[in-house]
Amino acid sequence: MKKLNKMKNVIKLVLCFAMLISVIQISPQNVYAAKKIKLSKTKVILYVGENYCLDLYDGKSQVLDLKWKSSNKNVAKVNEIGNIKALKKGKAKITVKYKNKKYVCNVIVKDALKNHVSYELIDIPENAYSGQYNKMIKIVNNNDVTVNVNISIKQYDKDGFYIRQNTNDYIVNKNTYIIALMEYDKGLIDFNNPIQYDEQLKISLNSVRKTDSIDIEYNISDPYIDNGWIYRDIVFTSPTVKSAKYSTLCYNSSGELTRVVTGYVYVPANEKVKKKDGYNLNFKDKYDIQKINIYFY
């Protein structure tokens, strides 16, 4: 009887061990199998006119020849390869079926980026020092993302004939504005019969797209005199490598713009970069600089 009980205990032990081995060997595979099929994104925020391509992966392999569907084709449509096109402000669900299971990506479409960008040309006051610059362009970005704005300014003569065009890209951080300095020298139309033309400028917005922000900070030192000049040191810093053009606008005690200059700065990550800005001591009263604003673009 004792031998029989011992035999039963041995059999139970062997069975338990076998079950433990099966759990160790099989269960992780089942868990992995349940997790390895997934969409590249389950939530996407797009702006009208933008595209995004969804992918479905089975493990590390991309699944092809799928049938994608949109719950609201007026807001966002999707083609046979999973490319989403944002059409109108609203919400939509992009669905794909694979191995009898549905996978869903929630899409939020916001207004077109261009709808929230404004721009204008501003004359620089004649009594303000501006070097070769005679215009400022103010670009306002009311989007909740940083944008790259492509703007053209066409120049015409007094009779409306085209002279030249200047096209530039400007980066404007979210919910802010920049002021860039523009150079438009007056010139001659006909070299054989020189005729001065009056400037007529027409500005147009070509495109707006999302981009990385310009994360540059700056500190301006108190003015100091050196060899007949008044200087200020501008120290730039950034947590990541950044480079940008910048406009410096100086105002007097009455709030009038008295001096504008431009520059370029390259800032390595977590380093301090110093620029020295100065003018002759004879212009101290003329400029009467009490406030300085710097705009990066």
Predicted regions and their residues:
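Terminal connector regions
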Residues: D185-W229, L281-Y297
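Asparagine-centered strand-capping/turn motif at beta-strand->loop junctions
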Residues: I139-N143, V235-T240
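Extracytoplasmic soluble-region selector
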Residues: Q29-A112
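Intrinsically disordered, low-complexity Pro/Gly/Ser/Thr-rich segments with frequent PxxP/GP/PP motifs
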Residues: F161-D190, L257-K284
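Sec-dependent N-terminal signal peptides of Gram-positive bacterial secreted proteins and lipoproteins
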Residues: M7-Q29
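Short, solvent-exposed loop/linker segments at the N-terminal edge
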Residues: V44-E50, E126-G131, P223-D226
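Exposed beta-strand face motif in extracellular beta-rich ectodomains
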Residues: G90-I94, V149, A244
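Strand-loop-strand motifs at the edges of beta-sheets in extracellular beta-sandwich domains
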Residues: V78-G90, Y133-I137, G228-V235
